[in-house]
C-alpha cells in the first residue's frame, strides 16, 4: 500500500493548486488526479448532484488503488465528506477545515471573509467549521463566475477586475483582515483579489494546509512511499477535454503534467489522450 498513489479529486483544474502543494511537501509520493471538467463548475449545481458526481470520481480513485483520498474541492467537500469517510477504507483529507485553521491563526481583528462557489457558500460549511473559533466573525460571499474565468485560463483583465470589485465589496464594507479563498481555483486569482482587497488583508489558500494534513495522515498511518521504490510517477485524468485540461493545468502545476487521459467513466464519450 505504501507504494500506491495519493488520489486527488477536483471538479476541474483548481485542485492542482493542492496537488502542487502536496508534491512540494511530499516529493517522493506519486499522485493520481481526476478533474471532473465535464461537469464543472460544481458551484451552481444542487448539492445532491455535486455529491453524485464527486462520489463517482472518488469511486474511480479507490478502484485504482489509491492509499489516501484528497477532496481538493470545497463544493465537493461540503457535499460529500461524511459520505466519503463512511464509504471508503482509505483516509480522506479535505480542504475546508485546513483553510479555517489557517485563517483563525492569521486574523488580527477576528473579522474573516470567505469567498467560494454558490454550493460552498449555501452549504454553510465554513460557518460550521468556524463555530468553535471564539471571537471570530465570518462574512461569506459567493463568486460564481470566478471558476469559469480560471477554467478558460483568464486571470487578469478589465472585465475580471470589475467583477472582482463587485464581488468583494461586502468584504471591504465589513473591514475583514483575512479572506479565505474558498475554492481551489481561486489561488490563480490572487493577483486581482489582492489588488482589490489591499495589502493589509491576508489571503488564505487551503492548499498548503491541506498538504500538511496529507503529510500528517501518511505519517500517522505509516503510508509514506518506500524510498527504495522506483521514482514516483503521476497520472492526470479528466472527464472532459484532455487538451484543454493540460493547457490550463500546466499553469497550476507546471511540467509534471506531461500527459492527460480520459477518466474511465468518460471513455465511452471520448477516447483520446494528449501529451506535451
UniProtKB/Swiss-Prot annotation:
Substrate binds at residues 10-11, 42-43, 74-75, 184-185. Belongs to the aspartate/glutamate racemases family. This is Glutamate racemase. It comes from Parafrankia sp. (strain EAN1pec). Keywords: Cell shape, Cell wall biogenesis/degradation, Isomerase, Peptidoglycan synthesis. GO terms for biological process: cell wall organization; peptidoglycan biosynthetic process; regulation of cell shape. It comes from the Bacteria. Provides the (R)-glutamate required for cell wall biosynthesis. Pathway: Cell wall biogenesis; peptidoglycan biosynthesis. PROSITE patterns: ASP_GLU_RACEMASE_1, ASP_GLU_RACEMASE_2. One of its GO terms (molecular function) is glutamate racemase activity.
